[in-house]
Amino acid sequence: MSHNDKNTHNYQISSLDKIINDSSVAIEFENVYFAYTEERMILKNVSFTINDNEYVCVIGHNGSGKSTISKVLTGLLKPKSGVIKLFGIEISAANLKYLRNNIGIVFQNPDNQFVGITAEDDIAFGLENRKVPPNKMWDIINDAAVATGIEDLLKKESLELSGGQKQRVAIASVLAINPKVIIFDESTSMLDPKGKNELKELMVSLRDVAKKTIISITHDMEEVVKADKVIVMSNGEVQYIGTPQEIFANEERLLKMQLDIPFTLKLAKTLKEKGLKIDLTLNNEELIEKICKN
């Protein structure tokens, strides 16, 4: 690359940085279609918007297309047609490598994403790939470990960690490279109840404290309760978009799409039908308080 080409490249990156930092909209899908073959369309005319610093759950039955959304967003798959924008910038082959720096992803199986010998090595891996100077690495690793509650696990090897702890290491590895968007692709599905609850709380903290945009692709209705927005997928199409309260208000509609409502809401409905004076709620503590007052 010549000196002039390098200056032009740096200017382009600087311009993209400004657009990203100034944008209040994190992600836009506009009429996106995707198919592995002509016979079967996986995504059909998918359109939605996710704001910066928003926690969004994408739900749907198996085969609904929800996981394909993360793959086309990260450039692992190329849409057949339509536009995908990240912070106002249309994703293309020319800028994909740069834009990927602003997206982190945590997968379903924690064992498949542990690449280092120890937790500390695993977090350092992404930093080494980005040529972060060794003298700056420790502070970044420590900050990511503190944010995910694994500062006491940094010297532990993979075999010494539980599934939930490995997922926290994976999240710390993502946080260390400081993306603006973090995608959780069925990240709680292989965890025990304790690990699931801890990860759900961490997602909320990443939105509230770290100011990240969180996208969780999930079939766990208990997780959806804490989201700002829910996108419901079925047969490759967006069926509904709304708050958790709006989405769960129509149980019959969800059941037709092979989805359920959270246990707390289900219990509140049952108690209300049995005569208790209880308003329907998605909040456990609120339900307990109302039961105690009856």
UniProtKB/Swiss-Prot annotation:
Residues that, per the record, bind ATP: G60, H61, N62, G63, S64, G65, K66, S67
Enzyme Commission code(s) on record: 7.-.-.-
Mode of membrane association: Peripheral membrane protein
InterPro entries assigned: AAA+_ATPase (IPR003593), ABC_transporter-like_ATP-bd (IPR003439), ABC_transporter-like_CS (IPR017871), ABC_transpr_CbiO/EcfA_su (IPR015856), ECF_ABC_transporter_ATP-bd (IPR050095), EcfA_1 (IPR030947), P-loop_NTPase (IPR027417)
Gene3D superfamilies on file: P-loop containing nucleotide triphosphate hydrolases
Signal peptide residues on this chain, from the entry's feature table: none
Keyword entries, A-Z: ATP-binding, Cell membrane, Membrane, Nucleotide-binding, Translocase, Transport
Localization per Swiss-Prot or TrEMBL: Cell membrane
GO molecular function: ATP binding; ATP hydrolysis activity; ATPase-coupled transmembrane transporter activity
Domain ABC transporter: 27-260
GO CC terms, sorted: ATP-binding cassette (ABC) transporter complex
Entry function: ATP-binding (A) component of a common energy-coupling factor (ECF) ABC-transporter complex. Unlike classic ABC transporters this ECF transporter provides the energy necessary to transport a number of different substrates.
Stated family: Belongs to the ABC transporter superfamily. Energy-coupling factor EcfA family.
Protein name in the entry: Energy-coupling factor transporter ATP-binding protein EcfA1
Species whose genome carries this gene: Ureaplasma parvum serovar 3 (strain ATCC 700970)
